[in-house]
């Protein structure tokens, strides 16, 4: 379990590895080697370990995407948990989960992700407001959230672009999330 605050861990990894690379760990069944699926009892963990072993000196962070593990059911969740545990302590872990609920539910996410899995940061969908961000920032000082502000998918313009003559939803998300982050000890970034 890492005791370093997220930002310090990230900056150290950037300096040591001379890298700003955050590598996604998103196992897609159709892209896994055929031998991984047919020969291994647990294809995800050996595959992820091989990637981590080959890249640990090249990255500053790993970003597993929760959805790619949930598609494998309980075995995928176990593989994700073991993958997170396998990542070297000096490399930041950003869980791409895009969670966004309120109060007790976000607090439960915080307990699971920050306390049990010890990820350093998590992506958050702020649509429900401050209640999606504050419980996570308050959970463990030094942990971080990345708030979705403007995404790159083609349909994003409809809601994230200019809705009127004003600045649009993305600008409002940035402004609001900056205020939410100022109220706690956590760190808040944007994607």
Residues covered by each model-derived region:
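Conserved anion-binding
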Residues: 28-29, 101-191
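Short acidic, glycine/proline-enriched helix-loop-strand junctions
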Residues: 91, 96, 142-143
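Conserved PLP phosphate-binding loop immediately N-terminal to the Schiff-base lysine helix
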Residues: 67, 71-73, 97-107
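Conserved N-terminal beta1-alpha1 strand-loop-helix module at the mouth
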Residues: 1-64, 69-82, 86-93
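Active-site flanking residues adjacent to catalytic metal/cofactor-binding acidic residues
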Residues: 25, 95-97, 124
